Amino acid sequence: MKKLILVTGGNGRFARVLKEKNKDLNLYFASKKECNILKLSSLEKIIKKIKPQIILHCAGLSRPMNVHEKNISKSIDLNIIGTANLVKIAKKNNLKLIYFSTGYVYAGTKGHYSE
């Protein structure tokens, strides 16, 4: 039986592409309403409901830096606090966590990056 993968940001851009392209994975796309990453109780509820083995974290803001700077508290909440909550839940429930990000973590400068 395939492992169940909880996808946060289930209505976002990346999730839409994943829905279209996926043929082999057992994915559960959770909406913000169903899986609010800012609330540990919401995360506990969805974990208990669907019992995933993996969390694919695609929720968050992925806009140019000038948009983030206009609403820095929302950016911090979603991209830092929400991710920290998922790390806590994954650790508590012994789940694997895969985190997706964008090139905007590099201050929006263009170019090729290496880490």
Feature roles, as predicted:
Residues 40-78:
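NAD(P)H-binding glycine-rich loop region in Rossmannoid oxidoreductase-like domains
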Residues 73, 77-84, 92:
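Conserved internal alpha-helix in NAD(P)-dependent oxidoreductase domains
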Residues 8, 30, 55-59, 97-103, ...:
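SDR active-site strand-loop-helix element
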Residues 15, 37, 64-66, 107-108:
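Glycine/Thr-rich phosphate-binding loops of Rossmann-like dinucleotide-binding domains
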Residues 4, 84-115:
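Conserved Rossmann-fold NAD(P)-dependent oxidoreductase catalytic core, especially the SDR/UDP-sugar
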Residues 23-45:
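Adenosine-cofactor binding site in Rossmann-like domains, unifying the SAM/SAH pocket
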Residues 2-23:
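N-terminal Rossmann NAD(P)H-binding glycine-rich loop of SDR-like oxidoreductase domains
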Residues 16, 20-24, 45-48, 84, ...:
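Short, well-ordered alpha-helices that flank and scaffold nucleotide-derived cofactor binding pockets
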